[in-house]
């Protein structure tokens, strides 16, 4: 009888141990690392000024309108430390000469991808730095120039990128401050000779059109400073955007500056139907 009781007790202990091991294995396997995409869609309006001596020695000034999209996500590998960002924008500008008798139009498309290493020196404060790649294409159109009315531009760059964010509360309202900076370090860009027409390029004069870009002849800084004000599932983005670029090649000098007010919406999205408390969520911005 005692032997039977001991055997039963051993079987019960073995069953309990196997059950606990199975529960732990299922729990460990069921925990997934989720990396939400922080998406921002914004409308920008502000002031712009342009100097392009290929078209005119005069500086034109006017307004700019830009539609911008931004997507940030933690990387699959080392997701606590590495984040990636993709940005795309389309812009249109209308500017007048100092005498206000000539109008200049500027159309641009920008695409960029970057990866940054981040850390949190203090609670609620995140900083990150890294690099990426950027593509810019666009054109200036000056109707009064009958011979050379268009100045095209195109560049591919390796960029240096930085991000900083700080989360706080204003009363009961959660607010996240964010600053993003991007600068090309080295790249390649297009520029014709001074006075060279695009008809000459069309006829086959392709020499000297591509140039190696660095800070001495192809400088640009793009800085976004914004506040994301939480409204529940989405946040209202209000901010300021500075975009400054300059260049000098073939005796052609270019200067372009925009100062824009930013209004948009930001939200975090996951490609799942539901959340579980055991799931590990790693956002791109803390």
Which residues are covered by each model-predicted region?
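Predominantly the C-terminal beta-signal and adjacent terminal strand-loop region
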Residues: 180-182, 190-192, 211-214, 218-286
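Outer-membrane beta-barrel transmembrane domain signature
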Residues: 147-233
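Outer-envelope beta-barrel architecture signal
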Residues: 33-41, 78-86, 123-131, 171-179, ...
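Transmembrane beta-barrel strands of outer-membrane/channel proteins
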Residues: 39-49, 86-94, 129-139, 164, ...
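Residues that define the transmembrane beta-barrel architecture of outer-membrane proteins
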Residues: 59-67, 103-111, 125, 150-160, ...
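Residues on the lipid-exposed face of transmembrane beta-strands in outer-membrane beta-barrel proteins
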Residues: 67-75, 109-117, 131-135, 160-166, ...
């Amino acid at each position: 009888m005692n032997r039977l009781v001991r055997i039963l007790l051993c079987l019960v202990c073995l069953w309990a141990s196997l059950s606990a091991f199975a529960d732990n294995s299922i729990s460990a396997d069921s925990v997934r690392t989720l990396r939400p995409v922080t998406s921002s869609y914004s409308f920008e309006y502000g002031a712009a000024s342009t100097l392009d001596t290929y078209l005119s020695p005069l500086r034109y000034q006017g307004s700019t309108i830009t539609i911008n999209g931004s997507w940030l996500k933690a990387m699959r590998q080392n997701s606590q430390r590495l984040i990636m960002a993709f940005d795309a924008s389309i812009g249109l500008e209308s500017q007048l000469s100092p005498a206000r008798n000539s109008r200049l139009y500027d159309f641009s498309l920008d695409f960029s991808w970057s990866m940054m290493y981040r850390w949190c020196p203090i609670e609620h404060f995140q900083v990150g730095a890294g690099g990426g790649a950027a593509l810019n294409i666009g054109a200036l159109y000056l109707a009064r120039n009958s011979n050379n009315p268009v100045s095209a531009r195109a560049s591919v760059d390796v960029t240096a990128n930085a991000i900083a964010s700080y989360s706080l509360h204003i009363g009961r309202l959660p607010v996240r401050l964010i600053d993003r900076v991007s600068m090309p370090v080295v790249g390649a860009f297009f520029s014709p000779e001074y006075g060279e027409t695009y008809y000459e390029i069309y006829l086959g004069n392709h020499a000297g059109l591509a140039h190696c870009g660095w800070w001495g002849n192809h400088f640009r800084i793009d800085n976004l400073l914004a506040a994301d004000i939480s409204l529940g599932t989405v946040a209202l983005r209000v901010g300021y955007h500075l975009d400054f670029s300059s260049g000098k090649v073939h005796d052609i000098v270019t200067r372009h500056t925009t100062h824009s007010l930013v209004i948009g919406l930001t939200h975090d999205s996951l490609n799942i139907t539901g959340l579980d408390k055991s799931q590990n969520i790693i956002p791109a911005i803390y």
